[in-house]
Amino acid sequence: MLSAFFKTAHCALRNMPIQTDLVGKWNFVSSENFDEYLKEVGVGWAIRTIATKTKPALEFAVNGDEWTMNSNSTFKNYTLKWKLGTASDEKTADGRDVSSVFSIENDHLVQIETGKGGGKDSRIERYIENGKLVIVCTCNGVKCTRVYEKAA
């Protein structure tokens, strides 16, 4: 019984760093292969053109078991709320309808988007590397990487 408690406590503590490190404001630094990723998930030319020129600022917050991500840019302001392990329907910033489930795997915040109405599935991983927020989006083998730095 006691060993089960320590195993659970260890897992909970192991999952905390991404939660604490992610909280706060992040400024856009760079993007690689974003247009190809957006094309693969089915985003049209006009939205892709705008989205690839946009440099959103992100802000993450955690309140109890609810997470929030705000994305603010000249193109669009977007808020996403979730609880780990719970599926939630959302309309993505680029207009796709998906069902998302978030989890923590190896200190990465992982979002699995399941496309609705014929939409494509996607995997989005967010993690901290060398003090920067790295976001890797993958759909059908097409991968993009976006990098942010913590706001002062």
UniProtKB/Swiss-Prot annotation:
Family: Belongs to the calycin superfamily. Fatty-acid binding protein (FABP) family.
Domain of life: Eukaryota
Matching PANTHER family: FATTY ACID BINDING PROTEIN (PTHR11955)
SUPFAM superfamilies per the UniProt record, alphabetical: Lipocalins
Pfam families registered for this protein in UniProt: Lipocalin
Key word Transport present: yes
Protein name listed in UniProt: Fatty acid-binding protein homolog 9
Gene3D superfamilies linked: 2.40.128.20
CDD domains, per the entry: FABP
Assigned keywords, A-Z: Lipid-binding, Transport
Binding locations of a fatty acid: 126, 146-148
Gene: lbp-9
GO cellular component: cytosol; nucleus
Gene Ontology BP, a term: fatty acid transport
Species assigned in the record: Caenorhabditis elegans
GO molecular function: fatty acid binding
